[in-house]
Regions:
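Alpha/beta-hydrolase active-site loop
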Residues: 170-191
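Short beta-strand/loop motif that positions the catalytic acidic residue
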Residues: 321-323, 328-330, 334
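Short alpha-helix in the alpha/beta-hydrolase fold that links the catalytic acid
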Residues: 314-315, 324, 338-348
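Conserved alpha/beta-hydrolase
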Residues: 148-167
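Active-site nucleophile loop of the alpha/beta-hydrolase fold
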Residues: 224-235
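An N-terminal hydrophobic leader/cap segment in hydrolases
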Residues: 7-102
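Short, surface-exposed "cap/lid" segments of acyl-processing enzymes
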Residues: 109-111, 115-150
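C-terminal catalytic histidine-bearing segment of alpha/beta-hydrolase fold enzymes
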Residues: 336, 340, 352-400
C-alpha cells in the first residue's frame, strides 16, 4: 500500500465520523426522518427514556443502529404512519392532485404531490411549499389544497429526503438545500417561468429556502418566509434559554404577612443550611441558577450546531440578496422561533434590510391544538387574505 493510500485512511475515517455526527444532529433538526410517530416518541423519551428504549425489540434497535452508521434512511418493518399518510395521499389523488417525484443531482428520489394549475391560465404558475422539521406533506394537504384554490395556481408539495416515502437520509444542511434546488429545477423544467414561481418556506423550511435562493441568485422567483428563523443557533438559544422565568422578581421581593405588615416577626421564613431564609428568595435563586444552566446549554448546543455545519444562517443568506419579490410572515408570540431571540423578521428590521420586503404579522394564538408557530395560515383570516392577495399579485394571476 502506498504512503498516500495509507494517509488517506485517517482522513476518510475523520470525514465519516464528522458526517455521522452531523447526521445525528440532523435527526434532531429534522425529526420527521424518524419513522412512526416522532412526536409521540420524543414525548416518551423525555418522560421515561430508559423505559422507552428498553421496550424496543433488540432486533429493531440493531436495525436502526445499522441504518444510522450506514447513513441510510430509517425504516420500520411495519410503519402504521406510512399507511395513514398513504390514505391521506390517495384522497387527494382522487380530487385532482397528481403523484410525482423529484430526482436530485445525487440521485435521491423525493416523494411529491402536485396540483396542476388551472387550465384557464395561459402560462403555468406554481407555489412550491418547503415544510418544517416535523412536517410530512400528506398531513398538510387540506391546507395546501385550500392554498392552491385560493391563489389560483398550481402547487408542489414534497418530503425532504428520508421523510415519509422519500429516499435517502439528511446527513448535512447541504442535503436539504439540494432537495429545494431539485424541486425548483423540476418546476422550471415543466415550463414554469421564474417570475411565475413562488417558494413558500415555513419554519426551518424558510431558512433552507432563503439559503437556496440566495446561493442560486435566480432572478424573478418569489419567496415567502413564513414564521422562519434568522439562524439555527439563535433558535436553539430562544428555545433553551428563553426569557427570564416569569415571577422571578416577584419571588425575590419581601412578602407581606396577612395583616399587611412585613415578615420581620419571623413568619414565612425557614431554617436552611444553618440560617433563616425566605422560601421565596431560595426559589428565585434556583430560577436564576436555572437561567444560567439553560444559557450554558444553549451556548454549547449552538456551538455544536455551527461546528457540524448546521447553522442555517438565513439572515446572512438574505444579506447576500434574494433577487425576487419577498414576503415575510412573522408572529410576535411565536412559541418555537422566539421573536426577540430568533425571528428573521426582527433581524431584518434591526439590520434595516426590509426596504423591499412586504411584511405580514400573524396574530392568531393557535388553532385546534397547534400553537402560534405551527397552525396553517388559513386559520388566521387577516394573514391568510394578505398572503393570498400578495401571491396572486406577485405571480400575475388574473382576477377570475
Amino acid at each position: 500500500m502506498s504512503a498516500s493510500a495509507v494517509g488517506s485512511v485517517p482522513r476518510q475515517l475523520t470525514s465519516y465520523v464528522f458526517l455521522l455526527a452531523a447526521r445525528l444532529v440532523g435527526i434532531f433538526i429534522l425529526p420527521a426522518q424518524v419513522p412512526g410517530d416522532p412526536v409521540g416518541l420524543i414525548e416518551e423519551l423525555f418522560t421515561a427514556p430508559l423505559a422507552t428504549v428498553r421496550s424496543w425489540p433488540s432486533a429493531l434497535v440493531r436495525q436502526l443502529l445499522l441504518q444510522l452508521v450506514r447513513l441510510e434512511k430509517f425504516t420500520l418493518p411495519e410503519d402504521s404512519q406510512l399507511v395513514r399518510l398513504h390514505t391521506m395521499r390517495q384522497r387527494y389523488l382522487a380530487a385532482g392532485w397528481e403523484a410525482t417525484s423529484v430526482t436530485t443531482p445525487d440521485a435521491v428520489v423525493l416523494d411529491a404531490l402536485l396540483r396542476p394549475p388551472p387550465a384557464a391560465l395561459a402560462e403555468p404558475r406554481f407555489v412550491l411549499f418547503v415544510g418544517g422539521n416535523f412536517q410530512k406533506y400528506e398531513d398538510w394537504l387540506p391546507y395546501f389544497d385550500a392554498y392552491a384554490r385560493a391563489a389560483g395556481v398550481g402547487f408542489l408539495a414534497f418530503n425532504f429526503r428520508g421523510v415519509g416515502r422519500s429516499e435517502g437520509a439528511v446527513c448535512c444542511a447541504a442535503d436539504m438545500l439540494t432537495d429545494v434546488h431539485a424541486c425548483i429545477d423540476a418546476l422550471l423544467a415543466r415550463g414554469v417561468r421564474p417570475a411565475h414561481l413562488c417558494v413558500h418556506g415555513f419554519s426551518i423550511g424558510g431558512a433552507v429556502s432563503a439559503l437556496a435562493l440566495a446561493s442560486r441568485q435566480q432572478p424573478g422567483v418569489a419567496f415567502v418566509s413564513d414564521r422562519s428563523l434568522r439562524s439555527l443557533p439563535h433558535t436553539i438559544y430562544g428555545m433553551v434559554r428563553g426569557l427570564p422565568p416569569s415571577g422571578a422578581l416577584e419571588a425575590a421581593a419581601p412578602r407581606a404577612d396577612d395583616n399587611g405588615g412585613g415578615a420581620d416577626d419571623g413568619e414565612g421564613v425557614v431554617m436552611m443550611h444553618g440560617r433563616w431564609v425566605r422560601p421565596g428568595l431560595r426559589a428565585a435563586a434556583l430560577r436564576r441558577a436555572e437561567c444560567w444552566v439553560r444559557g450554558a446549554a444553549a451556548a454549547i448546543a449552538g456551538a455544536a450546531v455551527r461546528a457540524l455545519g448546521w447553522e442555517l444562517p438565513a439572515e446572512a443568506g438574505w444579506a447576500a440578496r434574494i433577487p425576487g419579490p419577498k414576503l415575510v410572515l412573522y408572529h410576535r408570540a411565536d412559541n418555537v422561533v422566539h421573536y426577540e431571540a430568533a425571528s428573521l423578521h426582527l433581524a431584518l428590521k434591526d439590520a434595516g434590510d426590509v426596504g423591499d420586503v412586504q411584511e405580514v404579522e400573524v396574530r392568531r394564538l393557535g388553532h385546534r391544538g397547534w400553537g402560534p408557530h405551527d397552525f396553517p395560515l388559513v386559520a388566521d383570516e387577516v394573514a391568510w387574505k394578505a398572503l393570498i392577495a400578495r401571491v396572486r399579485e406577485t405571480l400575475g394571476v388574473p382576477d377570475s
